[in-house]
């Protein structure tokens, strides 16, 4: 078990940060090592609660799988986010999915969710769809945005 902190907002940035600690000629070996040994990665932000009292954790969760390991090993880090978006049943979650969940639960503001998003346009669209559904069907609506 290895726990560490890095200044990164998501899993892709964390892997990029790890690579930056090594000279470029060692990157392929580092990616191989990560693909074989990384079991999970969690990126967390603490955002202000909509009430102004306290903080709300939003988290990106990357869990190892054969496909994730292949993407890491081959250096195709840009493909990881798509796999995470489609793997919520396995426990994975992107930062943007977490932001939308916290907005739906009334814990963070739309402005805060959009400000902290990896893809502000996707989060803005998710918020708009949720708000339209809530106006049309009442507060019991629960729209999920998945890839």
For the regions a protein language model found, what residue spans apply to each?
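Short, flexible helix-loop junctions that flank or precede catalytic/ligand sites
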Residues: 1-147
């Amino acid at each position: 078990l290895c726990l560490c902190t890095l200044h990164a907002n998501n899993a892709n940035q964390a892997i990029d940060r790890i690579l930056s600690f090594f000279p470029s000629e060692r990157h392929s070996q580092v990616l191989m090592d990560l693909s074989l040994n990384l079991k999970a990665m969690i990126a967390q932000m603490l955002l202000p609660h909509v009430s102004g009292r306290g903080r709300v954790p939003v988290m990106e969760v990357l869990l190892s799988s054969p496909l994730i390991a292949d993407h890491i090993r081959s250096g195709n880090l840009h493909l990881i986010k798509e796999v995470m978006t489609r793997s919520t049943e396995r426990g994975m979650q992107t930062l943007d999915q977490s932001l939308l969940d916290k907005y739906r639960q009334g814990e963070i503001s739309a402005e805060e969710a959009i400000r902290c998003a990896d893809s502000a346009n996707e989060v803005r669209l998710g918020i708009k769809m949720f708000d339209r559904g809530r106006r049309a069907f009442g507060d019991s609506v629960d729209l999920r945005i998945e890839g």
